[in-house]
Structures are given as structure tokens and as C-alpha cells.
């Protein structure tokens, strides 16, 4: 198929995708505001449904999601998830695939404004909004989120690379935030999560979305914990993520 034809095909499917994506954000923003007075758990269920819906919307563009999940990663249980970061779709993937674990996220404070559903969830769903220029505030917010999540037996997620990868290559991990999260949630097993291919979805800034992108996701076996192991278990998770990515790349 020629480049021009592929580009036309991408746009043909991107237009209904963008309409569906925007509609989902607006509808679930309204739903979230309606249920929020009834407590955090109803709100979490609405946001979980949103993330499942957004995964389905990406299928309009022929996106295929291949998932490997350790049988030891159980539903309805709290985990500390350490993942690599390739695109904004990563959060949707983790939230949708671990919906029953009600994952909480670390996000830059700018995302807490003006984005239907997403900003609402980040502000009111027990997540950590951080100022990346203020390390003290960031670490404190992450630790508070993690401690609260552990007390409720829900999951926390951090993407230590911070900046999204533009080409799928894994950059250096920033360990400060991850160690703060793992120290505050020291009873939660650590799950290394690996995502590959999501960077291709947004390489054109959604204008258009490449048709037929394959995204692989792996939730590895939970890593055992012991007292004071935040730095060590974080490094083990990073090694597992890098090892899995290298193995996947070797297959192609």
C-alpha cells in the first residue's frame, strides 16, 4: 500500500475516532460529577468504565492490544505498579486493564485542569498531582497518595521515566518519586508493567492515528517485599522492564 493511500486510510478512521474519544470524555465527565457525592468507590467505577471505553474507542483505528498478565496479579487487590512510559495512552491501558484494582496515578499538575474526565479523575480520584519543579511537593504528594492507596488496598502507578518516549526507547528512570511511592506503600507487592507500541499511536499527535497499530502490555509477576527495600525493589522492577523490552525487540 502506497504512502498516500495509507495516509488517507489513517484519516478516514481517525475522524470517527476523535469524535468517539471526545464524546467519551464529555459523557463520563458528566457521569463522574453525578456520582461523586455518593463516595469515592462509585466515582472510581465510573472512571474505570471510562478507561475501558477509551481502549475500545482506539479500536476504531484498528489498534490491537496484546496483553500478558501474570496469574499472580489478582483482581481487586492493591499493587505498586512500576511501568515504562511511551504515550498518554499508557494510563488508559493500565487503568482499563487493571480496572478492578482501581489504580491511582502520579501526574503533572497541569493535567488537573480543563480536560474533561481526565482532570476530574486526577483531582478527585485519589491521585497525586505534582509540580515537577518542586521536588519537596512532588515527593510529599506521591507518598500521601501511596499511603492512602495502601490503606484502601487499591493500586498505585508510577512511570519513573517521566517524559514520554518519542521512539519507544526507554530513557533513564528518575528514582526519587518511585522510591517515595514504594516506601510509603511498603506492604504492596510491586508489579513491573511493560508497554510497547503505544508511542506509535501518538507519533503524529493524533493527526492522524496510524491504522492497525499493535500495542503489547505485560504485567509481570509481583516482586516480593521486605522492610526498607524501596530502592532495591525499584531497581529490580526497572531491570525486569528493560529485560522484557529487549526481548520483545529481539523478536522483530
Where are these regions (language model features)?
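A cross-family acyltransferase "interaction/gating" segment
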Residues: 116-120, 155-157, 166-232
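Short gly/ser/thr-rich secondary-structure transition/capping motifs
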Residues: 61-68, 139, 200
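Soluble, non-transmembrane catalytic domains of enzymes that act on hydrophobic metabolites at membranes
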Residues: 1-3, 67, 250-252
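Soluble extracytoplasmic domains of inner/organellar membrane proteins
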Residues: 138, 145-146, 156, 161-169
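Catalytic core of membrane glycerolipid acyltransferases/transacylases, capturing the structured
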Residues: 29-37, 43-46, 60, 75-134
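A transmembrane-helix-recognition feature enriched in membrane-embedded lipid enzymes
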Residues: 3-66, 120-121
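A membrane-cytosol interface segment of integral membrane proteins
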Residues: 123-148, 153
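A cross-taxonomic marker for long C-terminal extensions/tails that follow the last structured domain
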Residues: 227-252
